[in-house]
């Protein structure tokens, strides 16, 4: 694999992040790292067996070619790609920040990307370890997987939901699952030691809050017609509805649901149904035909940005441009407030005619300083500095077609 650099991209950001992490963890990390003589078995703060802690984000890209089954993990720190077990005929790839879930008709393959982040609120820890194949979940190509630190919820196309112990996945194995009672529309979403779901009952669908045993503990008095799409943010969980979205939050053990309406009639084909955002950000994007919806969760506002036909969209959040990969093969930057285009790259996609091919379309992955765009036919991934006029910072030449791509380590 060849890495082409246009400048040295990460040095300054890494130095700043190192300083921040050193400061934020100094108070408790230094004392915890030196156990007292009377406590020889004390575990240092942030210690994870078998993992290496780092001062900066340990980003990796999971890449898969459904045709050949070739799967790679691209380490964005070293620029090296590593092979892993092949997974053929995958139709979707989703990640929870550490694990990749490759959905096929015969099951869902779980891949531990070996890079993750632990957020302690006032500071974070970044880890890396050897990547490994975990195994198969008995869930088909249309199953939806959602995780938090404790459980992984798998909702199949028939509405049945299974819970898996995520701690077992971290040990490299899939433990037996627990089946939740009832059926559900859309994904069951773990949140604040509970589960959020739209329960099917008597021909209607209603939002419920379940405990981890599947027992209902709350039923917020809100309506959400045709629920579709979800995202976990720092301010709560967003659930897509026909007329906008619900924001579900937990406060002092109580759950509230607030409607964020579009404020206008929106045709079904222009609804926000698949949300994309930078993990940790409160600004969401969703393609909407020839435009992109931007949902500012903090301000509870929707903004529609007219762009032209959209292949993929994303943003790093407040103060950053809206990034849109369009059918001309170029990445475009837009000012969210004004809707005006501010930057544009050269065409990045080798085969523009296939750019909008459903779940196998190229994507935009975004972290705190860079964005990544996959060019399947060109066997390349581009690293974009979105704070510098969409400058191409690096390009990675691969030995596989990166049809499916997801970033871990965030």
Label each residue range with its predicted role.
Residues 374-410:
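Blade-level signature of beta-propeller repeat domains, shared across WD40, Kelch, NHL, RCC1
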Residues 20-24:
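C-terminal motif of bacterial Sec signal peptides marking the signal peptidase cleavage site
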Residues 43, 77-86, 118-137, 170-180, ...:
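A short beta-strand motif characteristic of beta-propeller blades
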Residues 291-376:
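Intrinsically disordered, low-complexity segments enriched in Gly and acidic/Ser/Thr residues
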Residues 25-29:
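Bacterial signal peptide processing site
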Residues 42-54, 86-99, 128-150, 178-193, ...:
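Repeated scaffold domains used in trafficking and secretory/extracellular systems
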Residues 53-66, 92-111, 142-163, 186-202, ...:
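Short beta-strand elements that form the blades of beta-propeller/WD-repeat-like
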Residues 193, 199-321:
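Acidic, serine/threonine- and glycine-rich low-complexity intrinsically disordered segments
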């Amino acid at each position: 694999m060849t890495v082409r650099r246009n400048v040295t991209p990460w040095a300054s950001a890494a130095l700043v992040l190192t300083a921040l992490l050193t400061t934020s963890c100094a108070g408790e990390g230094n004392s915890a790292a030196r156990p007292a003589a009377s406590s020889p078995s004390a575990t240092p703060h942030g210690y994870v067996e078998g993992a290496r802690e780092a001062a900066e984000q340990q980003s990796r890209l999971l890449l898969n070619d459904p045709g050949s089954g070739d799967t790679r993990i691209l380490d964005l720190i070293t620029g090296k790609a590593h092979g892993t077990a092949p997974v053929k005929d995958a139709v979707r790839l989703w990640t929870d920040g550490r694990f990749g879930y490759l959905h096929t008709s015969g099951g869902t393959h779980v891949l531990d990307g070996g890079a993750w982040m632990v957020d302690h609120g006032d500071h974070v820890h970044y880890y890396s370890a050897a990547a490994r194949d975990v195994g198969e979940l008995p869930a088909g190509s249309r199953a939806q997987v959602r995780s938090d630190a404790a459980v992984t919820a798998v909702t199949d196309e028939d509405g049945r939901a299974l819970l898996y112990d995520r701690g077992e996945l971290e040990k490299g194995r899939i433990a037996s699952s627990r089946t939740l009672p009832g059926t559900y529309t859309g994904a069951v979403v773990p949140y604040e030691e509970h589960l959020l779901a739209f329960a099917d009952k008597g021909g209607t669908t209603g939002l419920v809050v379940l405990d981890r045993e599947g027992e209902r503990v709350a039923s917020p008095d809100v309506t959400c017609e045709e629920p579709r799409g979800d995202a976990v943010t720092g301010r709560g969980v967003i659930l897509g509805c026909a007329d906008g979205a619900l924001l579900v939050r937990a406060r002092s053990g109580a759950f509230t649901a607030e409607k964020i309406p579009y404020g206008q009639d929106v045709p079904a084909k222009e609804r926000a149904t698949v949300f994309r955002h930078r993990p940790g950000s409160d600004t969401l994007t969703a393609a909407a035909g020839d435009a992109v919806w931007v949902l500012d969760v903090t301000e509870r506002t929707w903004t529609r940005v007219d762009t032209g036909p959209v292949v993929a969209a994303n943003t790093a959040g407040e103060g950053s441009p809206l990034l849109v990969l369009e059918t001309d093969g170029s990445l475009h930057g837009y000012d969210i407030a004004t809707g005006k285009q501010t930057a544009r790259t050269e065409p990045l996609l080798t085969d523009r005619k296939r750019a909008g091919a459903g779940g196998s379309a190229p994507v935009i992955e975004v972290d705190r300083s860079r964005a990544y765009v996959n060019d399947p036919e060109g066997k390349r991934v581009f690293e974009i500095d979105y704070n510098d006029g969409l400058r191409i910072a690096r390009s990675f030449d691969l030995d596989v077609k990166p049809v499916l791509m997801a970033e871990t380590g965030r």
